[in-house]
Amino acid sequence: VIRKTMLRAEGAVSYAFQGGEPTLRGIDFFEKVVEFEKQYNKHGIRVNNALQTNGYLINEEWAAFLGENHFLINEAWCEFFQKNHFLIGLSVDGTKEIHDSYRHTKDGKPTFDRIRHAAELMSHYGVEYNILTVVNQKVASNITEIYEFYKKQGWNYQQYIACLDPLEEAHGENEYALKPEQYGKFLIELFNLWYADWKLGKQPYIRQFENYIGILLGYLPEACDQRGTCGVQNVVEADGSVYPCDFYMLDDYKLGNFNENRLDEIDTKRTEIGFVERSLLLDEECKTCEYFHICHGGCQRNRDLNELTGKYQNYFCESYKMFFAACLPRMKETVKTLEKR
């Protein structure tokens, strides 16, 4: 994977390691990753490494490695991350009580205290990390408590990811499922908290809000769901199988295998299945919405097909309408302030 992508890359290339749990491969695997990146980087390409983890195995060695190689967790892991400049996404789902109700070991033991220790280690070793929080019903209902708790921990880089129902299952039937009205209220409450801190110059970085403000300033958002169009990426399984997105790792979307196919063959298959093109098929009601210029229809994974029109509409459409109606004026105020600086 590294050899083929390095030979083709221009300017920069990004490798993101997710799971399962990627730290189960051990530090030796990631040391080999860094070695290969150096070996095949013949043209001074900028390499960005990222790793998403539950933090359970992070120690000092890991933290140091991640910091140096731009990754991000125990002391051994931390040393590795710091040394190799890994950017880490650390999964934390709210306060201890909420987190442990969902994220526990296979024998039911809590994990929160160990994850918080991993965050402390990464901070100590200078590892860059973001907090990744899945927004389920409990998180959405307790966001004020969670926001204040994160501030006390010094967790100032945050991403909130709406909890998804399993693909091809009906929406809202699982106990953790996030319903549109609930998600809309969550976004409004979180923005109110963020905006109050922004007025004081003490706001955390919340990617979703920062991207919206960037859109209003004329910048392309970094998150593909906020662009409304799927990007071109290769998600690779351990056996080399390639898919267009980590939400669509199914046989119907398989693009090929890195052990058997060239990158141009993988790209041809992507075009054949029309994956990126399908993200452009938005319902007319969506395209004419007053908020389309900032919403862009959201992530393809959250869209439902309208059988009558053959186009798609986002399940969380009403959530975003609630949010923008309540918060867009203050976003525009923020933009005016930034433009004056």
Could you describe each region identified by the protein language model?
Residues 28, 61, 76, 114-117, ...:
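Generic recognition of stable, solvent-exposed alpha-helical segments in well-folded globular domains
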Residues 2-18, 25-163:
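Radical SAM/AdoMet-radical enzyme domain recognition
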Residues 249-341:
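Flexible mid-to-C-terminal extensions adjoining Fe-S/redox cofactors in radical SAM and related proteins
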